[in-house]
């Protein structure tokens, strides 16, 4: 092998090494971008989970069912009904005679929920 062939091989290896190094830098840059995006998405995901948790907690507070699975508003209607007044659309506010039962009122209080 003469000196020129040896020099050409070294030059080719050097060029290949530089190409490989450039590809490595490109890959590293792409990896950094992906890792940054991943970190941002994880933070955003965490914030969204916290907001969802707060929204769910607020919703549960607002519709918290108590006695017999009735909400506060239905409990108020139940108290009015127990006091002897109609809470149905037909006779709302009228006094119930002789504590009679009203199917309409009972449907409003205990019906489909």
Swiss-Prot record:
One matching Pfam family: YabA
Family from the record: Belongs to the YabA family.
Compartment(s) of residence: Cytoplasm, Nucleoid
One GO term (biological process): DNA replication
Lineage: superkingdom: Bacteria
Cytoplasm found in the keyword field: yes
Cofactor mode of binding and number, as noted: Binds 1 zinc ion per subunit.
Gene name in the database record: yabA
The protein's name: Replication initiation control protein YabA
GO cellular component, one term: nucleoid
Job description of the protein: Involved in control of chromosome replication initiation. Inhibits the cooperative binding of DnaA to the oriC region, thus negatively regulating initiation of chromosome replication. Inhibits the ability of DnaA-ATP to form a helix on DNA; does not disassemble preformed DnaA-DNA helices. Decreases the residence time of DnaA on the chromosome at its binding sites (oriC, replication forks and promoter-binding sites). Tethers DnaA to the replication machinery via the DNA polymerase beta sliding clamp subunit (dnaN).
Ligand binding (Zn(2+)): 86, 88, 102, 105
Originating species: Pediococcus pentosaceus (strain ATCC 25745 / CCUG 21536 / LMG 10740 / 183-1w)
InterPro entries, per the entry: YabA
């Amino acid at each position: 092998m003469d000196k020129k062939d040896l020099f050409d091989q070294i030059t080719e290896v050097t060029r290949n090494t530089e190409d490989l190094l450039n590809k490595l830098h490109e890959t590293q840059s792409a990896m950094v971008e992906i890792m940054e995006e991943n970190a941002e998405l994880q933070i955003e995901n965490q914030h969204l989970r916290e907001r969802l948790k707060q929204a769910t907690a607020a919703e549960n507070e607002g519709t918290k069912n108590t006695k017999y699975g009735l909400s506060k508003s239905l409990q108020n209607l139940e108290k009015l009904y127990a006091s002897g007044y109609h809470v149905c659309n037909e006779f709302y506010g009228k006094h119930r005679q002789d504590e009679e039962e009203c199917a309409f009122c009972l449907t409003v209080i205990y019906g489909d929920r």
